[in-house]
Amino acid sequence: MSILQALQDFLEGYEGMELRPPGEILTDLTRAAPPSYSLAPAGGGTDTQDVVGNRYYTSRYHFFALECAGDEADRAENYDFLESLASWLEDQEDQGNYPELPGRYSVEGIAVQYATLYDVSQNGAGLYQVQIELTIKKEVVPNG
């Protein structure tokens, strides 16, 4: 399992999404019709290394939500959803409840950087983007 897949699985635990089919957060792109969700890597790098050699990364991901955005009520409801998702992620951070990563990787922190309307199609579907930031530790393998 990849780090991306682990984060997708973790986000599927948020009960505010209308996943159709259930348990489906796609990679990189949403489906053509709302509601649809996807997750895409957005960069990061090695931030620090501790004295024993453990590495700490900041990895960013774009969570996309394709929702109906044809009128003011739809858009207001969509921002309620985004605020609720951000609040849920903050709660997970406060509780130390993080995605289970493969191998020697573990999550040290999770945060939402921003949430915004990214694009609106001619059919009135809005593509919303939430930037999620993970602080990841890669544990060093002891010699011997």
Locate each region found by the language model.
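Charged, amphipathic alpha-helical segments and their flanking helix caps
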Residues: 1-28, 43-144
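Glycine-rich loop at the start of a catalytic domain that most often binds anionic cofactors/ligands
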Residues: 40
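Extended compositionally biased segments used for macromolecular assembly or nucleic-acid engagement
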Residues: 32-36
